[in-house]
From Swiss-Prot:
One of its GO terms (cellular component) is extracellular region. This is Galanin peptides. Endocrine hormone of the central and peripheral nervous systems that binds and activates the G protein-coupled receptors GALR1, GALR2, and GALR3. This small neuropeptide may regulate diverse physiologic functions including contraction of smooth muscle of the gastrointestinal and genitourinary tract, growth hormone and insulin release and adrenal secretion. Keywords: Amidation, Cleavage on pair of basic residues, Hormone, Neuropeptide, Secreted. It comes from Canis lupus familiaris. The lineage of its organism: Eukaryota, Metazoa, Chordata, Craniata, Vertebrata. GO terms for molecular function: galanin receptor activity; neuropeptide hormone activity; type 1 galanin receptor binding; type 2 galanin receptor binding; type 3 galanin receptor binding.
């Protein structure tokens, strides 16, 4: 961040907010993989349901 601030100059502080928004979008992109993990979590309870049916 220091090197980026040096390249961007004093306005880097204002740009820092923009950089902060970009990781937010990246975070949203990371949510779909978590859904896959949740699906795996549901697989556990489904197994329990199968055992209950038996």
């Amino acid at each position: 961040l220091n090197s980026a601030g040096y390249l961007l100059g004093p306005h880097a502080i204002d740009n820092h907010r923009s950089f902060h928004e970009k990781p937010g979008l990246t975070g949203k992109r990371e949510l779909p993989p978590e859904d896959e993990g949740r699906s795996g979590g549901f697989a556990g309870p489904l197994s329990l349901s199968e055992n209950a049916a038996v």
